[in-house]
């Protein structure tokens, strides 16, 4: 029978799509191989289903597979499967028409049929992946024969608006069942990201990256050369067929069927890591949104965890096909240390299959994954404290970012967080443990925020709390300065900074007993306080007696609702305008320096020397909390003058 050859035009939409595909849709030209393997996998799934449903279909399904064939001399690459194949009409309808892969229709049939044993893994719903071949090929040939039919069909196009299609008589049996796609490759061009797709190692790399977990074996014949055994002899060349993909989708297997060693090896593969995972999280969701996830919490923080371009470490698969690495839509930024994969069964994607739509499903999956990771951290905290301590040391700082960004899980994040405190040099505490230890009469959770533990321990702000035996949380991460401004309580207990507002640590009985003494001191210091308020008016908004100092002469505090200097510096560093706020200078009425300053002011009134002493008092308070002097040279001059006179008096 003479071949029935036609030359047809692509539909207008298909022509536009071809141009879009070649020039802009795919961000990576390597994606073409993923698309061809996905289509081949789809064809194998369809054949398996058809053989299951149609007992009259006489086909062999014992060795379903995908084959990659390269010809270096001809510069061709062929992807071949022995799946369902296509008829001539289907080729015209599916290849010459925009986005009609047939898989979406088949999935609808599956929903209706509910064939429990068919277990299809169909991935071709995107319908346009075949056209990606034209990114790397000048000409594409497709040869296909549908299972159960004798005629085959050959399709060919250069991607320039038209294609030829012909019927191939199967009388000679030269066309096997299934589909083969042959790409006549464009010249290699590294600048245009056109690689050598006839290279065995490049093909291995792409299959490993994109299609490692496809359910069907992806095979390729490879040459192996053995050096000559004797001098002057010839090397031996053998050809062996190798399977390039692992086909091990661990997330699809029940957890009790997977060993810890297998999980560890998979973690190292997917995370490009050298350590072992601290925790493994396997989950499956069924119902409205079906997906499987295999996530890992690493043992060590990556070096780039806090870099500006740090990315989420979760990969997205759809029907075991790699879609996207570092999928930030599946995990919030504060969980960017989590590694693993999510395999969705029916996720809506946009045209490139590389950029997810912000749809209801992806948001639902993200919420569930987030809650699962946080619940795992909570389990570690309660049941595996050693692992939790390792986790917190490595990732606690980044986890606390969620206190600012994730209001839905804020309570959980507070409970799984740990903080250093004055109770122990080594053991951090949770907020729940802190509250449990609060003595009778304490109604607030006290904290100090600063740059280092040592700086905070030496801070004048802690003196009264140490004297009373109250535990104080020591917050030293930059994010701490921010979240404490937005979270005001835990378990009904207010969070109170030791450096903000007024501190009242005495019981009612103590306050009554000390009231007369307090009033007397207020009178004694009224004049010097008024004078200091005037002299230091450029630096402070108020001067008052302190109830938080026991050893230091003075300290600076912020209004209850004011912005701390550290937080103001952070805002300014990020480009946000922050007005300069004057703070409050508190004096220790029992300190010799403050008492001497009061007596000197009473005896000789205000003078320049006393004003210099006032500036030194303010400067020492600023330095004691780790602050920076506004005019270090003036402070040094005043200090040198006082030291000179002191040495002179002693000599």
UniProtKB/Swiss-Prot annotation:
Belongs to the heat shock protein 90 family. SMART domains: HATPase_c (SM00387). GO terms for cellular component: cytoplasm. Residues 570-651 are annotated as: C. This is Chaperone protein HtpG. PANTHER family: HEAT SHOCK PROTEIN 90 FAMILY MEMBER. Residues 1-353 are annotated as: A. It comes from Mycolicibacterium gilvum (strain PYR-GCK). HAMAP family: HSP90 (MF_00505). Signal peptide: none annotated.
